């Protein structure tokens, strides 16, 4: 898509607000609809859009599959680690009340940390799945349309 300058400009204009919206959904998730899963998908969509315009190779130069696998594992560790910490502090798995002296603050912090782990994992896995499928197909040429 070297000569599709309109797509390139529009994608450069859209990708930053998409990432910003993903961050909003992530950090607003404990107050309303949203959270880690939704934010992870929206965050991955920004990178998938980049890949659709510039190619899968351009995406893998920015975010390597190895890094995506690491982030997927880190997200799961954040989620599970939060549960283990609450158990070590004497509460149930993901019993957030053990995280702070005030139950309201403990619930907020627990949800934020767990949703962050979910968001990291979902974004990484979505991009990994996209790269796996997109890299096996021959690229479409403009002449084929």
Which stretches of residues belong to each language-model region?
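Hydrophobic alpha-helical membrane-insertion segments
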Residues: 69-85
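Short aromatic-rich membrane-water interface segments that cap or initiate transmembrane helices
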Residues: 101-116
């Amino acid at each position: 898509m070297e000569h599709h300058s309109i797509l390139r400009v529009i994608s450069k204009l859209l990708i930053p607000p998409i990432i910003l919206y993903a961050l909003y959904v992530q950090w607003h998730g404990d107050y309303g609809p949203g959270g880690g899963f939704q934010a992870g998908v929206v965050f991955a969509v920004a990178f998938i859009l980049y890949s659709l315009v510039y190619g899968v190779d351009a995406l893998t130069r920015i975010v390597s599959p190895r890094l995506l696998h690491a982030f997927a594992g880190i997200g799961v560790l954040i989620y599970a680690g939060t549960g283990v910490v609450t158990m070590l502090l004497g509460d149930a798995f993901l019993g957030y009340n053990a995280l702070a002296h005030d139950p309201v603050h403990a619930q907020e912090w627990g949800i934020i940390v767990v949703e962050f782990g979910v968001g990291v994992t979902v974004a990484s896995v979505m991009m990994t799945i996209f790269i796996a499928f997109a890299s096996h197909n021959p690229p479409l040429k403009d002449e084929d349309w």
